[in-house]
Curated annotation (Swiss-Prot):
Keywords: RNA-binding, Stress response. RNA chaperone that binds small regulatory RNA (sRNAs) and mRNAs to facilitate mRNA translational regulation in response to envelope stress, environmental stress and changes in metabolite concentrations. Also binds with high specificity to tRNAs. InterPro entries: Hfq, LSM_dom_sf, Sm. This is RNA-binding protein Hfq. Residues 69-82 have a biased composition (Polar residues). Pfam families: Hfq. One of its GO terms (molecular function) is RNA binding. GO terms for cellular component: cytosol. It comes from Actinobacillus pleuropneumoniae serotype 3 (strain JL03). Residues 9-68 form the Sm domain.
């Protein structure tokens, strides 16, 4: 497994497994929304009203709708989306 995918795969798998809604921003600025149905080395299948095959080289950013816990090499990590952090900051 390539070093670059050692974080990518567990993260995408957690999003898929927990059915967390995501916004995927493409390098051309287009925003796609849905749930990750499946992924491999080159593509992500994104499901909303239809399934879309999105090539990873076209993706700029993946933003989950809520925080996600993923396991990378035995260490658990929790990542919060910026939108969730902004709401939490305002509540304090």
């Amino acid at each position: 497994m390539a070093k670059g995918q050692s974080l990518q795969d567990p993260y995408l798998n957690a999003l898929r497994r927990e059915r967390i809604p995501v916004s995927i921003y493409l390098v051309n600025g287009i925003k796609l929304q849905g749930q990750i149905e499946s992924f491999d080395q080159f593509v992500i299948l994104l499901k909303n009203t239809v399934s879309q095959m999105v090539y990873k080289h076209a993706i700029s950013t993946v933003v989950p709708a809520r925080s996600v816990s993923h396991n990378n090499g035995g260490a658990a990590h929790t990542q919060q989306s910026p939108a969730v952090e902004a709401v939490a900051d305002k509540a304090e």
